Amino acid sequence: MDRIVIRGAREHNLKNISLELPRGKFIVITGVSGSGKSTLAFDTIYAEGQRRYVESLSSYARQFLGVMDKPEVESIEGLSPAISIDQKTTSHNPRSTVGTVTEIHDYLRLLFARVGQAFCPECGRPIEKQSASEITDRLLKRPPGTRAILMAPLVRGRKGEYRKLFQQLLKEGYARVRVDGVIYLLEEAQGLSLEKYEKHDIDLVIDRVVLKEEERPRIAEAVELALLRGEGLLRVLYPDTGEEELFSEKFACPEHGSVLEELEPRIFSFNSPYGACPACSGLGYRQEFDPELVVNPELSLAEGAILPWSRGRDTGRSYLWDRLRALAEHLGFDLKTPFKDLPEEAKRAVLYGLPEPFEVVFRRGGKETFRVEVRYEGVIPWLEKRYQESDSEGVREALEGFMSLRPCPACGGTRYKREVLSVKVAGRNIAEVSALPVREALAFFQGLEKTLPPFQAQIARPILREIVERLGFLVDVGLDYLTLDRAANTLSGGEAQRIRLATQVGSGLTGVLYVLDEPSIGLHPRDNQRLIRTLKRLRDLGNTLIVVEHDEETMRAADWIVDMGPGAGIHGGEVVAQGTLEDILKSPQSLTGAYLRGEKRIPVPKERRKGNGKWLVLKGARAHNLKNVTLRIPLGRFVAITGPSGSGKSTLVHDVLYAALAQRLMRAKTTPGPYEALEGVEHLDKVIEIDQSPIGRTPRSNPATYTGVFDEIRDLFAKTPEARKRGYGPGRFSFNVKGGRCEACGGDGTVKIEMLFLPDLYVPCEVCKGKRYNKETLEVKLRGKSIADVLDMTVEEALDFFQNVPSIARKLQLMVDVGLGYMKLGQPSPTLSGGEAQRIKLATELGRKATGRTLYILDEPTTGLHFDDVAKLLSVLHRLVDAGNTVVVIEHNLDVVKTADWVIDLGPEGGDRGGEIVAEGTPEEVALTGSPTGAFLARIPEIAARIGVAAD
């Protein structure tokens, strides 16, 4: 069968649609936000493919896998097992790294176990284990006739007189011994008076031989005996040259005895007790109390500078407080001096305590009453003890607020045991290789085979082939700047998705249905072609790709396009057009076609705003890969921050700028990345970050509760004559508290029924029929509608219904303006897409009283948005700027960048080759620089015309 045939799909807002998709092709599903793209791709096609695969397993296996619900669809034919690669499933496990997720780390472990060379961590000499016969062979490789003395080391660097040892050796029939480098007959050695408290070395002479092939049996016997007496060690002295050699039959340094386990793959895993650093259990960092969070340096100790203790000080009787007072008296500092002005010695003593006890004199009425010896342990040791000993979750959680993550001092953040780090391949240990950017790691492994001896090269060849292939796939999806030891939970959604894409290409499966969610997110236009090549490669292996995407380049590269619409929510859910790119371009109904033909487009503003003349300047930002960057943001303008993936945009804007502003303006507990100075903060009142995180994680939260419009609607219901007669207040109309809600389902509207081998069933509550309220509450009507009817309205219907209530109508109008008119007021938050959640937040912000002194920060706000949605979003953002605010967006979408007043382009590449500002100015000025983004801006006709005119 060469087609996937879908009949009667009715999931969410799909309107009983039927369509056929070609198998083994690259298919793009597009359409406006909320039109049902993800519902068709993920909730219908993927869910059914996954469900059928899981259904084929035993009931025992199914209970561990969590069975998918059967989607609302009559039939789907021609389905293959489905794999979904979406944005949401980034690992939150701190042990996951880029290397473990892509499985490159497993091959690295194998490589180091098979061809790694161990070195002593103490002295750096190579450690090899050799059998007695291998040692004999090595000795016989010396020039024939070389004299050698074979000895067994008995005592190495230990104190003692050793008279009994010499007597015992004499009894056993040995003749000579070497003591501290001098050879004696054992009779003489007995007469030696060794210093009892000095360290000595004693070697037993086993045999004196001449190295030649005829003597092999005698030499072999001496080697075996020496290894037996020396517990696996043999020392050989060549008397003619004075040279010495030490051999070991164990994996140990013969000099320092540093013992290594057998080189097995498991010791190169930081997730196994055999390889993980014992101090941090292989995490690479430890949670420690941070003096900067524990102390407020502006306050004095008397005013409560020590934040965790500030509660106990009021009583004056607090045990801790008495100790602190005693310390102040002992060291002679004043408790009323601000902490920052105390001498360094006093600060250190307050925080870390004093090693010795000190005497305190207690006085009453000016007279000495008694003396007592006191120990002061210090704030941080006291907090650590409290944290370790407390059984209360609450106490531990409160104390964690004063802790921050620090690289583990034992392993330096590498996650491994010291012995593991002493195993090297081509001069690098596993942590050093993992710390290389993918691009450099690829070059290292491509050249590695040539540097290995032939025998090792043969072992390494198949392992290297796998490593090089997988690194190549990471480069192909534009992730050449990542390092293999980068924690997976620090990756953006787009990066995590592309890593999983690279892993899938690496797995080489065929005949699979892949469903992807906007893989182009976070990709600079110049990396797009590499991604498209990877997608086509996955298709050419014999797979079907269904990609939910808005990117024009990806659409033009697809074999088949499905355009959903015509509107969003209840106005969508239909297939407007489908076919090849030519079919879509010819379709008069297709909104996507109109944009692709160039009929509809997002215009470039005629004038760029000049702003209010004030600047926000962040100097010397150095977090992650930033190279001492100075960021200048013109206030009162629409600013776009651009640059290739991994060039440091999010680090600069989120980790440094936002964190620093939130700390200064909002007293937030954020810890900004390192920077030197922040100027111009006085021109701002607040900073607000509007991201795509959900507006609520429970079905009890919805657009009406988030925007605050629900409170006003409840007030209106409470003012109706019927509600007054019954004495109902606004609380009666809440489904979260007892009183008005249906108690059978607790106001959820659904009841969960647990099924053992099937997914939990959520069925509408029998009592309230899914309306969430009890019968009495629903009897109160406002113009013929109950509170449940209002929650079931779309925003557009509600706007019509409440048009005479200005405060409600204004909030609803803003939701229509940001393109959410189709959404139901009571739609549960978890069912909203990221783009929808972000636009609800925007509408809420627009509804606040404007001071015109707010800085808004948005990270890739066009995620999940169609050309038409981008136009709506831009009009909202420009409204915020017109009110005098400043909007900073991190964005790759050129439709957004071209409408900005000011562009700041980071680069020139990603990772260690990024972290600098390569161009800044108006889009026209940046287009002239030829920077990574400038080159693409110069291709936009309106901008090209302007710079062409300017250039003339």
UniProtKB/Swiss-Prot annotation:
SUPFAM superfamilies: P-loop containing nucleoside triphosphate hydrolases
Pfam family, one: UvrA_DNA-bind
Predominant localisation class: cytoplasm
Domain ABC transporter, first and last residues per copy: 309-591, 611-938
Location of this chain's protein in the cell: Cytoplasm
Gene3D superfamilies membership: ABC transporter ATPase domain-like, ABC transporter ATPase like domain, ATP-grasp fold, A domain, P-loop containing nucleotide triphosphate hydrolases
Cross-referenced SMART domains: AAA
Keywords of this entry: ATP-binding, Cytoplasm, DNA damage, DNA excision, DNA repair, DNA-binding, Excision nuclease, Metal-binding, Nucleotide-binding, Repeat, SOS response, Zinc, Zinc-finger
Family per record: Belongs to the ABC transporter superfamily. UvrA family.
Function summary: The UvrABC repair system catalyzes the recognition and processing of DNA lesions. UvrA is an ATPase and a DNA-binding protein. A damage recognition complex composed of 2 UvrA and 2 UvrB subunits scans DNA for abnormalities. When the presence of a lesion has been verified by UvrB, the UvrA molecules dissociate.
Name this protein carries in UniProt: UvrABC system protein A
Organism: Thermus thermophilus (strain ATCC 27634 / DSM 579 / HB8)
Gene coding for it: uvrA
